[in-house]
Amino acid sequence: MRNCIESLLPGGEEVEIIIVDDGSTKDRTAEIADEYAAKYPTIVKAVHQENGGHGQAVNTGLKNATGLYFKVVDSDDWLDKDNYPKVLAKLAELVHQGNAPDMMICNYIYDKQGAKHKKAVRYASAFPLDEVFTWRDVKHFRLGQYILMHSVIYRTHMLKECGLELPKHTFYVDNIFVYYPLPYV
């Protein structure tokens, strides 16, 4: 979890980090969340709730989000130190130009613990690279080229307006999180 949070901190004041403690009892999640919130009070917010599962944790994060964009980063995930600033800079540039996208899709690496190889999922063959596009510009996806929760950044207001609410006590809510908002993009 610390690795995850540390990977987000370089975003500085441009990023709002919401740590949702989903009723953890067998680890130090609550303590670590409070520690970071105390150390970085203008960036990190710790939210504690009874266990509601992954979907409810995402709902709580979204409910507490005040930033322009919303991205789910699970506690065992981290953002690449070289690409994270580029993503933030691109979003800032688009917003400054008055062309704020509802959704940004980013490549990601699936690094399963114990696996011999990492799996890189890239979208260059399906989406135009480094430009704003519409659904008409989307090409065919390759096998294994899924859009997952880890690859999307949504405009917060749009997510709230579309009424996205993930089921409680449910894991693998990626498809709902990714695909429910698409008609609003």
Please provide the spans of the model-predicted regions.
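Nucleotide-sugar donor-binding/catalytic module of glycosyltransferases
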Residues: 1-185
